[in-house]
Amino acid sequence: MSTLTPAMATMAVALSLFTSLTQAEPRPGQYNNDTAQQSIATYQEAMSYLLGRNGKVKSEEKAAELFQSLAEQNWSSAQQMLGYLYYEGKGVEKNALLAYKWLSLAVRNNPRTAEDIQSRRQQLLSQIPPDSRQQVDQWIAEWQPGS
């Protein structure tokens, strides 16, 4: 099983910044400019904790907490990173259901990421018991920002 390497994290940051500039996460007009800037700063802080850079002591737990707060606000880049953290068990307990949920929400909110995430989602789906698949599909269908 792969791990989140610094190169992967750097690539995710670049993709996330590009996404946020081209797609105005989470939705145009949903937040004012100050809120968007704060969310970008929070994302950058989460990446700093994840990698132990920019004066931050490495803390995957703190990174997961920050990504979680942004993911709940519907930021697809944070949903993607949180899904990866659940997939790898970095900063959170490894959990295929939650990894699949957050990666699926990231794809739903930013279809441009679908190709990058699809193989990992398929791997996760094979790990989820059939009786739990319906539950996770329902979570995804009913999920709303802030829930």
List where the protein language model places each region.
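Hydrophobic face of amphipathic alpha-helices that form TPR/SEL1-like repeat modules
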Residues: A41-L51, K56-V57, L66, M81-E88, ...
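TPR/TPR-like (Sel1-like) alpha-helical repeat modules
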Residues: E93-T113, Q122, D137-P145
